Amino acid sequence: MKKMTSIAILGLLIAATGVAYAETLRAITVEQNASYALDTDSLVQSNGKTAFSVQTVFTSKMKAPNGAEYTKATNTFLADCKAKTQALTGVSLMDGSGKVVYSYNPTVTEAPMIAPERNSLDAKIMQTACGLK
């Protein structure tokens, strides 16, 4: 029931922004102060890897590295579903209106392909994305 309520809140928050979203979101999990959903429209496979993005909606304002406040995030990942590894390839943090207040694209050295810890948020994200490919 808690997950359904959080997913409903996620939907309301997205609708409340007044921005049209073309994504088809699939709930991943609700943890601490945020809801996580896979953008299934973002799934792209190439050379044995799967690229995808995850939308996050926070229940309270967060602070970006540059000091800006944000309530939403879009993180992009590259996963090797067979090897069970993934890497973070991009971060975009948005305020309540959907305006990007901070973005970051790590290098391969900064964010290498790694196997997420069992039952971690990253493991849940990869399991959801790889399960839909």
In which residue ranges do the predicted regions lie?
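Bacterial N-terminal signal peptides that target proteins for export
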Residues: 1-8
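Cleavable N-terminal signal peptides
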Residues: 9-10, 20
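N-terminal signal peptide c-region/cleavage motif recognized by signal peptidases
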Residues: 15-17
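N-terminal secretory-pathway/extracellular module detecting exported/lumenal segments
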Residues: 19-74, 80-133
